[in-house]
């Protein structure tokens, strides 16, 4: 496996055709703030891109953000998210017909032909942060599914909905506490 550091990726001035305005969208992540948004946000911002993110599980689609984006990438970590995205993608394409549309996450390669039929230009699976960053820089990711060993950056959660809008635990005394989770692997044995 190849080891790749975020610092090894192309920096701001290297690619004149870069897609500078990036919109990442998640449709569903089991009531969690999506790591699949926070980690690529860190990579893309480090490379100098203007990144917005929307979690449609807890907020509405911002059509102005869609119109403003050069690259719109939809995160597909599971089947439910993919089904929800299938209704979203035509709306995104209609709102911004010139944007490059990507789908990334474990279920993107599994549904590649279906997603391409909906108008998706690029499909990324496996370790997708490098591919998204290359795509935003105006390049072409080397493969659909990357198995590269990445050196993850601290996730950038700025601009994402507050944690109190996600899953919580109701304690026996009625107190509501924010619930967290740890993602030790990407995906499960079924993907």
Specify the residue positions occupied by each region the protein language model found.
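Acidic, low-complexity intrinsically disordered segments
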Residues: 2-191
């Amino acid at each position: 496996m190849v080891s790749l550091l975020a610092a090894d990726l192309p920096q701001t001035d290297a690619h004149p055709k870069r897609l500078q305005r990036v919109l990442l969208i998640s449709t569903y992540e089991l009531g969690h703030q999506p790591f699949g948004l926070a980690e690529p946000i860190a990579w893309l911002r480090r490379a100098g891109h203007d990144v917005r993110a929307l979690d449609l599980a807890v907020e509405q689609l911002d059509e102005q953000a869609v119109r403003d984006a050069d690259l719109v990438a939809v995160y597909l970590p599971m089947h439910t998210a993919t089904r929800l995205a299938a209704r979203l993608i035509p709306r995104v394409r209609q709102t911004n017909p010139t944007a490059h549309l990507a789908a990334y996450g474990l279920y993107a390669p599994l549904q590649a032909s279906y997603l391409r039929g909906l108008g998706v230009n690029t499909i990324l699976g496996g370790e997708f942060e490098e591919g998204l960053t290359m795509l935003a820089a105006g390049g072409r990711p080397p493969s659909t599914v990357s198995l590269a060993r990445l050196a993850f950056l601290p996730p950038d959660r700025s601009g994402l909905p507050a944690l109190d809008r996600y899953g919580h635990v109701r304690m026996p005394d009625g107190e509501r506490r924010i619930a967290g989770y740890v993602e030790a692997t990407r995906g499960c044995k079924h993907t």
